[in-house]
Amino acid sequence: MAAPGEALTPQGYIQHHLTNLHVGEGFWTWHIDSLFFSVGLGVLFLWIFRSVGKKATSGVPGKLQCFIEMIVEFVDNSVKESFHGRNALIAPLALTIFMWVFMMNFMDMIPVDWLPWLASLAGIPYLKVVPTTDVNITFSLAIGVFVLIIYYSIKVKGVSGFVKELTLQPFNHKAMIPVNLLLETVTLIAKPISLALRLFGNLYAGELIFILIALMYGTNLLLSSLGVTLQLGWLIFHILVITLQAFIFMMLTIVYLSMAHEDH
């Protein structure tokens, strides 16, 4: 499926599915589809958990309540095992990150042509439905975590303690302050960059594989049949990938914030 005036070639098909619906140019470009799906899924997550929380009973819970309680307990145990400070906000934050990232990743399970085709009927030429295949979204999440790291580092250790952490580690000598500052600054900045690029790279690669498999349906009968098998196999494997990436993002956030709460 291609946008109007776009050649229906393998290259055009791939390019079409990797192009965001956007307004503006350069630095001021807004990816409308990424914003729509990320915000929409965030609202959906809040609505589901709030609804279940309001209807929760101490008696025999329903299937959805059981599922939500399993997730909450899993995240709570992960926080207890990895976070060594005192902060009541870390568990809710970890739950939000895990569920939000997972739900954005889960959009990759929808066949690549379905939603773009529906959008084309409404006159929308491009539509990327997986927010985490947009590096702007993954960096936004990572920068949010980075801001929390800086905030809690200063709150727990004070400005002087935070500066000492950057200048007197790993070599505790005044002569090594420039070296320490360089090493610690690089380490600090690498945290959000690695968070963002790891999530983006894995989901972008997964989406690209789905697109390449979808191309096989437009060839001969043999490759079309093979495409069905490949898509099913990759779909099953990708469920593990999207869950693992959400878990890794959550766990690294917990670990980084735990380090920020350590007062040496």
Curated annotation (Swiss-Prot):
Q: Which family does it belong to?
A: Belongs to the ATPase A chain family.
Instruction: Name the predominant localization.
Output: membrane
Biological source species: Shewanella oneidensis (strain ATCC 700550 / JCM 31522 / CIP 106686 / LMG 19005 / NCIMB 14063 / MR-1)
Annotated gene: atpB
- Alphabetized SUPFAM superfamilies for the sequence: F1F0 ATP synthase subunit A (SSF81336)
Q: Which UniProt keywords apply?
A: ATP synthesis, Cell inner membrane, Cell membrane, CF(0), Hydrogen ion transport, Ion transport, Membrane, Transmembrane, Transmembrane helix, Transport
InterPro entries, sorted = ATP_syn_F0_a_bact/chloroplast (IPR045082), ATP_synth_F0_asu (IPR000568), ATP_synth_F0_asu_AS (IPR023011), F0_ATP_A_sf (IPR035908)
Matching entries from HAMAP family are given as:
ATP_synth_a_bact
The set of disulfide-linked cysteines is none
State the Gene Ontology terms under molecular function.
Answer: proton-transporting ATP synthase activity, rotational mechanism
Q: What is the protein's membrane topology class?
A: Multi-pass membrane protein
Q: Cite a single GO BP annotation.
A: proton motive force-driven plasma membrane ATP synthesis
Its function, per the record, reads:
Key component of the proton channel; it plays a direct role in the translocation of protons across the membrane.
What name does the UniProt record give this protein? Answer: ATP synthase subunit a
Q: Subunit info?
A: F-type ATPases have 2 components, CF(1) - the catalytic core - and CF(0) - the membrane proton channel. CF(1) has five subunits: alpha(3), beta(3), gamma(1), delta(1), epsilon(1). CF(0) has three main subunits: a(1), b(2) and c(9-12). The alpha and beta chains form an alternating ring which encloses part of the gamma chain. CF(1) is attached to CF(0) by a central stalk formed by the gamma and epsilon chains, while a peripheral stalk is formed by the delta and b chains.
Q: Which residues cross the membrane?
A: 29-49, 90-110, 134-154, 177-197, 208-228, 235-255
User: Where does this protein have coiled-coil stretches?
Assistant: none
